[in-house]
């Protein structure tokens, strides 16, 4: 037989034994940890997007204020 298949069969068997050895509460705790980590990652990405949106909005407001000040003849420090 192929040596790659021969070396993969024991690995697959040990992986199957490991998976079947877990009980329901162990699976629930593993999925809970996984879902918790994913939700923290999603919340962090959303937070970064919100911060960037606020920075962009502030930069736009500053630009509009400088344009209005220039129209009114007010000196601007750049």
Curated annotation (Swiss-Prot):
NAD listed as a keyword: no
Any one Gene Ontology cellular component term annotated for this protein: membrane
Alphabetical list of InterPro entries matching this protein: Phage_holin_HP1 (IPR032118)
UniProt keyword terms in alphabetical order: Cytolysis, Host cell inner membrane, Host cell lysis by virus, Host cell membrane, Host membrane, Membrane, Transmembrane, Transmembrane helix, Viral release from host cell
Main subcellular localisation: host cell
Periplasmic side: 24-29
Domain of life: Viruses
Membrane topology type: Multi-pass membrane protein
Cellular location(s): Host cell inner membrane
Transmembrane domains' residue ranges: 7-23, 30-46
Cytoplasmic side: 1-6, 47-78
One GO BP annotation of this record: killing of cells of another organism
Function recorded in the entry: Accumulates harmlessly in the cytoplasmic membrane until it reaches a critical concentration that triggers the formation of nanometer-scale pores (pinholes) causing host cell membrane depolarization and endolysin refolding and release into the periplasmic space. Once the pinholin has permeabilized the host cell membrane, the SAR-endolysin is released into the periplasm and breaks down the peptidoglycan layer. Determines the precise timing of host cell lysis.
Protein name from the UniProt record: Holin
């Amino acid at each position: 037989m192929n040596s790659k298949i021969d070396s993969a069969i024991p690995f697959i068997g040990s992986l199957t034994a490991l998976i079947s050895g877990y009980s329901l509460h162990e699976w629930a705790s593993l999925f809970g940890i996984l879902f918790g980590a994913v939700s923290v990652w999603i919340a962090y990405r959303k937070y970064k997007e919100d911060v960037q949106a606020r920075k962009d909005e502030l930069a736009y407001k500053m630009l509009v204020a400088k344009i209005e000040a220039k129209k009114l003849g007010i000196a601007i420090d750049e």
